[in-house]
Amino acid sequence: MGGVAIHATLLHTDDVLFFQYVEGSPTTDHTSLVQTYNWRTGVVSQAATPYRRDIFCAGHNLLPDGRLFIAGGHDHNTGKKQDGIGVRESDVYDPIGRTWTPTPLLGEPRWYPTNVGLPNGKSLIFGGTQSPGVAARTVDEYDAVTNTMRTLGSAATKTVGQYPRMHLVPDGRILKSGTSGTSWFFDPVGARWTSGPSMVYGSRSRGATALLEGAGTVLTAGGGAPTRTAEVLDTSQATPRWRSTGSLTYARVLSNTVVLPDGQVLIIGGGQAFKYTNPVKVPELWNPSTGIWSPMAPHQASRMYHATALLLPDGRVLCAGQDNGPLARFAEIFSPPYLFRGARPTIVDPPASVTRGGQLRFTSAEAVSVAKVVLIRSGSNTHEINTDQRSVPLVFAVSGTTVTADVPSSGNTLPPGYYMLFAVNSLGVPSTAPWVRVL
């Protein structure tokens, strides 16, 4: 791929934007190697910022118009970079014009922050560190429409750690599900925190999380010592409680998760110690109905510290990264079992955009065999987190070759932005997804 995909985002242009650090000399310091990889054509292109900016170790999320918002990043030091030193810069990348625009400064420096997009199109920035041992405790809010940044009130102030695992759930709150042993909820409207239930296992340092199909339940797996255990939290319950699910075949830290069109979850990469020791090269597929993890075909490269994984519109999974070893600059693509069960359904004449609370229609010659219609948001992944990833199944009806689906009205379930539209047949085989913008 030319560079190492330490950060990776799937864009609605079919490019994957990825970036890594550059270090070692005054001429390259405070810069990053930024490139795009087109998954359809295999073409790699340069996408560097036109100004000196180190976006390595930043947080990022996709905006409603498909641009990428990047907050914080790495230090300004000359020579080898020092971990933990944050910056206040943030930027927006436009995949159509392939342009970069600086945005207003964050309220405090951030290294290893987490971004979360909101139903109103704004973005919140949580956590990270200002400098080694000094936490970034405030919450910043970026409004892309007005291009303004503000820091929320003192009730939002809390130490949440580096790259906290955060997910927007259907009641409008944001769940923090790692890496400490206690979960928390943040209310964006009231801008305040409330405590949530403790995890069964306790602290899952460098564990993986995934927002499951429907966007109301969170899975967390691995992390810690490491552990093979996994657990889930259904936030729709009156009194949510973490409950154990099936254990992984392999204990692992530093892994990434991908929610597939059939609703199953792939955990990929990781290893049995930080950072590059005893890699686990066998992905596992989790069935939410049974709680069972099944080993899959191994990948060739180690995918531990600084690795990434993303669902592609054709239902395959791109895995890349880990910043050492002979295969660091090579990506691999995994084909899940559903791609070996026969022909795909097809989607013809999909809408370019839909409105929440409305309907979407498309034509499919295989409409009678369609068992699921699902919108899956583009992923934006780094350091075992992907707050953009969400899968929302739609209620639908079939009439002849026409499929009509209801689009949820709640922005908490379906935040604005670009989604992949999948039709999945009764064998679990997904179509290739067109892009649909949810307004």
Task: Cite the ranges covered by each PLM segment.
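Kelch-like beta-propeller repeat domains
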Residues: 1-439
